[in-house]
Amino acid sequence: MAVCQICGKKTAHGNRVAHSATTTKRTWKPNLQKVKAVLPDGTTKKIYVCAKCLKAGKVRKAVR
């Protein structure tokens, strides 16, 4: 599974708990977007970034 290249956020695992307390496995997936970004060395590359990092401005998007 893909991981956020900025903060390292990835799929979380846990249990779905019913009212009767029975549990089954489930996952929480991060809101990852494939973004064309400018890297620190000046090159552009498509990377996976979570929506939280995009909103915080941690990624400089490449100009089209």
Curated annotation (Swiss-Prot):
This is Large ribosomal subunit protein bL28. GO terms for cellular component: ribonucleoprotein complex; ribosome. GO terms for biological process: translation. The keyword Ribosomal protein applies. It holds the Pfam family Ribosomal_L28. The gene is rpmB. One of its GO terms (molecular function) is structural constituent of ribosome. Belongs to the bacterial ribosomal protein bL28 family. Keywords: Ribonucleoprotein, Ribosomal protein. The keyword Ribonucleoprotein applies. HAMAP family: Ribosomal_bL28 (MF_00373). InterPro entries: Bacterial_rp_bL28, Ribosomal_bL28, Ribosomal_bL28/bL31-like_sf, Ribosomal_bL28_bact-type, Ribosomal_bL28_sf.
